Amino acid sequence: YPDFLNMKTNQYERYHIIFLVKEDTSMDESIPKEERKYGRKNLYEMISASNVKYFKKRPLIPKSLLRKKRDCIIVGSACEQGEVYQAILDDVDEDKLEEIASFYDYLEIQPNGNNAFMLRTSDQEYVTNKRGEGKKNRYWKVNSEEDLININKKIIALGDKLGKLVVATGDVHFLSEHDAKFRAIIMASKGFDDADNQPPLYFKTTREMLDDFAWAGDRAREFVIDNPKKIADSIMDNIPPIPPGTFQPHIDGANEELTEKCLNMAKDLYGDPVPEYVANRLQRELDSI
C-alpha cells in the first residue's frame, strides 16, 4: 500500500467503511487467553492508530492494518463514499469490481434520497472546482432515480454472485427528520455549499425503508428485514463499549509500598497506634484506588 502519510490527499484514495464488533471475550478470565476473542480490542487498536499514527487531516485506517486486525469484526461496504460504490461510479471492470467487493463481509444499498445529491451535479465528466482546477466528476453519468436504482441493482448482483449478504441501510446521521437542520449548520460551518440540501439521513421505520426499496419487489423484505437480522444475530450479545474494570498499571510491590507509605504518614500525623477512625478512613481510601 502507498505511503499515504507522505503523499498529498489527492494522491491516494480513501473510503468510508463500517465496522461491527462480532465477538469479544478478551476480559473473560474463565477462557484461556489463547482462545479468547478480541473484536472490541482490535477495533479500539485501529481507532487509536488512526488518531495517533495515521492521522492526516482526519483519522485514517490503512487497509493493511485492517487486514491484521479484522478478526471478530464484521466489515460492511458503507455508503456512496464506500469503495464498492465508488468503483461502480468509476466503471471499473467486472473482475476488479468483484475483487473489491470480496473484501467485505456484507454489501450495502441505500435509499435513493440518500444519494439524490448526485442528480444535482453536472452531467459533464470534468468540472472546475473553486480554485479553477479541472476535476473529474464521478457522478456525471447519474442523472435520474433510475440510475441510482441501477447502481443498487449492480450491488445486489455482486452480492448474489459472491455469496455476500446485501443489506439495506439508512446511513443514519441523526435520529429524527427535523434534526437535519443541526447537521446543515455543521456542514455549512465546514464550507459545504449545499448544506441546506440535507439528504434524509434520519432513523427510518421499517415501513419507510420497505417503501424506499419497493423497486426491489419481493426481495425488499430480504434486504430491509431478513439480512439485517442475520447480521445482528451473528453478533455476540451484551458487548459493553467499555470493558468493566479500572485497568490500572501493574507494578510489582506497588500496593504494599503505597499502603506502607500512607500508614507511616498517618503515624507521623496522628501518633502510633493510629486512631481507629483514622485507620478506617485510610483503609477506605486505599481500597478505592
Language-model features, listed with the residues they occupy:
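Generic recognition of stable, solvent-exposed alpha-helical segments in well-folded globular domains
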Residues: 38, 95, 99-102, 150-157, ...
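Active-site glycine-centered loops adjacent to acidic/histidine catalytic or metal-binding residues
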Residues: 171
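Generic, well-ordered alpha-helical scaffold segments in large soluble proteins
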Residues: 46-50, 99-103, 154, 158-162, ...
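Hydrophobic alpha-helical scaffolding
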Residues: 33-36, 141-148, 196-202, 214-221, ...
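Non-catalytic structural connector segments
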Residues: 111, 125-134, 165-168, 216-288
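Extended substrate/RNA-proximal surfaces in nucleic-acid metabolism proteins
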Residues: 1-161, 223, 260
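Flexible loop/turn segments at secondary-structure boundaries
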Residues: 82-85, 114-118, 174-177, 240-241, ...
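Phosphate/diphosphate-binding loops
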Residues: 14-22, 155-161, 165, 174, ...
